[in-house]
């Protein structure tokens, strides 16, 4: 997948309907070569009042955006920032579509860049997480999330999440990631292409299989150490011949059977 610059984006809006609502904050972190290289965020005047509900959720007030630029003033800057990048967002379908709607409203073409959804990536590679909400993942994974529901903080944490997921992917056996990649074709936008990209890089410099794993019928499985019997050390004693002595020595380890006792004796 090219290019290799990931633009991790989050937007805050006055609501969820792109035809009626407006962006009030745009946040973006750039990732190259496995690290965050730059950050960009800006408050945006929506041209209307921000509801109390949104103010309470985001902490972005009408007073705060009073002197902020309108989206028309920054649309070209945002478009240029994202051009030739891979768009990443947590629930990409909202951010990508809303942002494109606003760009076209301002007379700019819609973005035609690849997109990756970190919600789907988290569901695949962090399957035991109890919740895939960004705030919950941040708490569970130990990310510092200073201002949930503010675009700059959400973009920062989403960037950290992408890097962590990629790290987890690269620790998987190649044969496991191959199978995940095949199944990932059902994911949205270009999430599957990202998985295939990581897979191809791993194949270029393959790591030896972890010695605790083994390949069985095309699956990388944890080796099982099957203990055929339990050895119990009873000390230097003579073999007990009476029923009472046997029960005292073996306790609940063995069940007393008269015929077996006769054969053992």
Language-model regions, residue ranges each:
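Residues on a specific face of well-ordered alpha-helices
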Residues: 120, 132-136, 156-160
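Acidic, divalent-metal-coordinating active-site segment for phosphoryl/phosphodiester hydrolysis
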Residues: 150-165
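Conserved pre-motif I regulatory segment
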Residues: 231-265
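Phosphodiester-processing cores and adjacent nucleic acid-binding clamps
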Residues: 103, 120-123
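Acidic two-metal-ion nuclease catalytic site recognized across multiple nuclease folds
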Residues: 2, 164-242
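Conserved non-catalytic scaffold segment of RNase H-like nuclease domains
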Residues: 1-115, 127-149
């Amino acid at each position: 997948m090219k290019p290799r610059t990931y633009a991790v984006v989050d937007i805050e809006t006055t609501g969820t309907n792109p035809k009626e609502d407006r962006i009030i904050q745009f946040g973006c972190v750039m990732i190259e070569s496995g690290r965050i290289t730059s950050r960009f965020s800006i408050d945006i005047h929506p041209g209307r009042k921000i509801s109390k509900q949104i103010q309470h959720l985001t902490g972005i007030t009408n007073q705060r955006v009073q002197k902020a630029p309108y989206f028309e003033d920054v649309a070209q800057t945002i478009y240029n920032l994202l051009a030739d990048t891979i768009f990443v967002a947590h629930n990409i379908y909202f951010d990508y579509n809303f942002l494109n709607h606003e760009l076209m409203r301002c007379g700019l073409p819609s973005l035609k860049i690849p997109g990756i959804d970190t919600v789907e990536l988290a569901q695949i590679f962090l399957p035991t997480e109890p919740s895939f909400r960004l705030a919950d993942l941040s708490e569970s994974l130990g990310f510092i999330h200073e201002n949930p529901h503010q675009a700059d903080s959400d973009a920062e944490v989403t960037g950290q999440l992408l890097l962590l997921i990629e790290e987890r992917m690269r620790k998987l056996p190649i044969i496991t990631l191959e199978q995940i990649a095949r199944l990932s074709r059902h994911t949205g936008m270009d999430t599957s292409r990202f998985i295939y990209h990581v897979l191809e890089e791993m194949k270029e410099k393959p790591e030896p299989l972890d010695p605790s794993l083994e390949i069985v019928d095309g699956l990388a499985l944890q080796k099982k150490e099957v203990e055929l019997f339990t050895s119990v050390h009873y000390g230097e004693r003579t073999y007990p011949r009476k029923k009472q002595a046997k029960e005292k020595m073996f306790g609940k380890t063995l069940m007393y059977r008269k015929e077996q006792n006769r054969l053992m004796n």
